[in-house]
Curated annotation (Swiss-Prot):
Species whose genome carries this gene: Cupriavidus metallidurans (strain ATCC 43123 / DSM 2839 / NBRC 102507 / CH34)
Gene: mraY
InterPro entries reported in the protein's UniProt record: Glycosyl_transferase_4, PNAcMuramoyl-5peptid_Trfase, PNAcMuramoyl-5peptid_Trfase_CS
Chain's role: Catalyzes the initial step of the lipid cycle reactions in the biosynthesis of the cell wall peptidoglycan: transfers peptidoglycan precursor phospho-MurNAc-pentapeptide from UDP-MurNAc-pentapeptide onto the lipid carrier undecaprenyl phosphate, yielding undecaprenyl-pyrophosphoryl-MurNAc-pentapeptide, known as lipid I.
EC number(s) recorded for this UniProt protein: 2.7.8.13
Family that this chain belongs to: Belongs to the glycosyltransferase 4 family. MraY subfamily.
Pathway(s): Cell wall biogenesis; peptidoglycan biosynthesis
Positions of transmembrane segments: 25-45, 74-94, 97-117, 134-154, 167-187, 190-210, 222-242, 259-279, 286-306, 311-331, 366-386
Lineage: Bacteria, Pseudomonadati, Pseudomonadota, Betaproteobacteria, Burkholderiales
One example GO MF annotation: UDP-N-acetylmuramoyl-L-alanyl-D-glutamyl-meso-2,6-diaminopimelyl-D-alanyl-D-alanine:undecaprenyl-phosphate transferase activity
Enzyme class (EC, first level): transferase
Topology in the lipid bilayer: Multi-pass membrane protein
Protein's name according to its UniProt entry: Phospho-N-acetylmuramoyl-pentapeptide-transferase
Keywords, alphabetical: Cell cycle, Cell division, Cell inner membrane, Cell membrane, Cell shape, Cell wall biogenesis/degradation, Magnesium, Membrane, Metal-binding, Peptidoglycan synthesis, Transferase, Transmembrane, Transmembrane helix
Pfam family, one: MraY_sig1
């Protein structure tokens, strides 16, 4: 919005030309989201407290968590509002990728909001059923995947619909450009052709998987938001490179016109995340809830797909991956041993993995900060793949 206004007025006010620079708008998006989050955070926390929207704590977990009962939750609403306002203020409204990421983020946020609302307001600990939640995640993920399959490969909005129709008429087979291949980091000449169907399947898995992985990681004060900020920032760098014809050619990456604008979204997400961390740091005054965790995970997955860095997301978001694997292994092993021995056994003291370390004697802040440090290192490894290829 401000970009359009600045372009309209820049002939009379030359200093407004600075708004044309993507990096300037990215910095301003970050600052705007940070200010909104810090400014409205106390008010949101008071309102959540007045409405008695408090967190329920399981008695089977670490006993130190019992004091968290009643802490306001659904604070992720503040994060999403900060991201949306900041992004819309500073982005190019004509960029299709911005709208895809925003719609996926807000769509997954809506799923999380309904889940949190049922848990807190209706006092239903189950919230949305797993089947219902998965249905809506799948619907949003597939719609986004189908659209991205053609918008990533085609620079013109006019051509996207005709490409989709030709794909349907061709029995869901079509020739696709190199930029739709699965890029293998650290190897400049290694990529795997996916085809349209393969691209759609991979995109769906990345978006839905990332959303649920971030949600599973959200279990300690400040644990998930800093990795989201770090990974989002790393993906923002990739977005800037992929959207720049010169840099992408120099670094031997496919050029994706319009992808650079996602730097605005990633910067806004980082600013909103840091503002939320101000209130979510131990001892937390507010929790994110599913409304924030599902949305931010979906956002990371969508950005990673657009900039063709699905494997890099897997690397940089290693904490999310390990947390998810710990739950899957715990459940699978428990079911297997129950069938085999008549009694379920556990691989970990408790899943997700952060609870395993807590029950092993680590303090909550130790788990959180150490997971942050690991994420910092993983993000640096991911960023190094820009040049080390």
């Amino acid at each position: 919005m401000l970009l359009t206004l600045a372009q309209w007025l820049q002939n009379d006010y030359s200093f407004l030309r600075v708004v044309n620079y993507l990096t300037f708008r990215a910095v301003m998006a970050n600052v705007t989201a940070l200010v909104i989050g810090l400014g409205f955070g106390p008010w949101v926390i008071r309102r959540l407290t007045e409405l008695k929207i408090g967190q329920a704590v399981r008695t089977i977990g670490p006993q130190t968590h019992l004091v968290k009962a009643g802490t306001p939750t659904m604070g992720g609403v503040l994060v999403l509002i900060s991201i949306a306002i900041s992004t819309l203020l500073w982005c190019d409204w004509g960029n299709r990728f911005i709208w895809v990421v925003l719609l996926v983020t807000l769509g997954y946020g809506a799923i999380g909001w309904v889940d949190d609302y049922r848990k807190v307001v209706y006092r239903d600990p189950r919230g949305m059923s797993s089947r219902e939640k998965f249905f809506w995640q799948t619907l949003i993920g597939l719609v986004a995947a189908v659209y991205l399959a053609f918008s990533v490969s085609e620079a013109s909005n006019v051509r996207i619909w005709s490409l989709f129709l030709s794909w349907i008429e061709g029995g869901m087979f079509a020739d696709v450009p190199y930029k739709m291949n699965l890029i293998v980091p650290f190897f400049k000449e290694v990529s795997y052709p996916l085809g349209v169907t393969g691209f759609i399947v991979l995109t769906y898995l990345v978006i839905v998987g990332s959303s649920n992985a971030v949600n599973l990681t959200d279990g300690l004060d400040g644990l998930v938001i800093m990795p989201v900020v770090l990974v989002g920032g790393g993906l923002g760098v990739f977005a800037y490179v992929m959207g720049n014809a010169v840099y992408s050619k120099y670094l031997l990456f496919p050029h994706i016109p319009g992808a650079g604008e996602l730097l605005i979204f990633c910067s806004a997400m980082a600013g909103a995340g840091l503002a939320f961390l101000w209130f979510n740091a131990h001892p937390a005054r507010v929790f994110m809830g599913d409304v924030g965790a599902l949305a931010l995970g979906g956002a990371l997955g969508t950005v990673a797909v657009i900039v063709r860095q699905e494997i890099v997301l897997f690397v940089m978001g290693g904490i999310f991956v390990v947390e998810t694997l710990s739950v899957m292994l715990q459940v699978s092993w428990f079911k297997f041993t129950k069938r085999r021995y008549g009694e379920g056994r556990r691989l970990f003291r408790m899943a997700p993995l952060h609870h395993h370390f807590e029950l092993g004697g680590w303090k909550e802040t130790q788990v959180t900060v150490r997971f942050w440090i690991i994420t910092m290192l993983l993000v640096l490894i991911g960023l190094s793949s820009l040049k080390l290829r």
